[in-house]
């Protein structure tokens, strides 16, 4: 795919943003190592792998959109700077949505760490103090 895109003058790269949760994909150094171990590397993919929101997930752009829940999503800079996005993905189980596919992969995969935090903010527990016994 990368070679085909290059034949049209494109500069293809594989990308992802760091995760909100701790682990090997929460920083770009270990994220790249994990990607390489899973076969996503310049040799097998014939293009570079770039962690779009930088080393610690703080490299992003706020993109104004007309969204009710997220009016200015924080998008990894490398993704925001891309001329075109070609999404190649698979389905996978997700505990809240049932399945994750193209929309989930683009929505969460393009969001920086801060963007993911904002997207998950609505799932925070809420306390009804009227029903609380103060335990």
What residue ranges belong to the model's regions?
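N-terminal and secondary-structure boundary signal
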Residues: 1-135
């Amino acid at each position: 795919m990368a070679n085909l895109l290059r034949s049209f003058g494109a500069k293809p790269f594989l990308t992802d943003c760091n995760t909100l949760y701790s682990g090997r994909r929460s920083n770009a150094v270990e994220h790249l190592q994990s990607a390489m171990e899973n076969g996503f590397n310049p040799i097998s993919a014939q293009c570079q792998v770039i962690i779009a929101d930088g080393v610690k997930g703080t490299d992003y752009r706020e993109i104004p959109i007309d969204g009710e829940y997220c009016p200015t999503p924080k998008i990894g800079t490398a993704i925001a700077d891309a001329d075109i996005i070609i999404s190649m993905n698979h389905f996978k189980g997700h505990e809240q949505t049932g399945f994750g596919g193209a929309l989930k992969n683009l929505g969460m995969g393009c969001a920086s760490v801060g963007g993911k935090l904002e997207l998950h903010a609505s799932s925070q527990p809420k306390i009804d103090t009227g029903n609380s016994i103060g335990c």
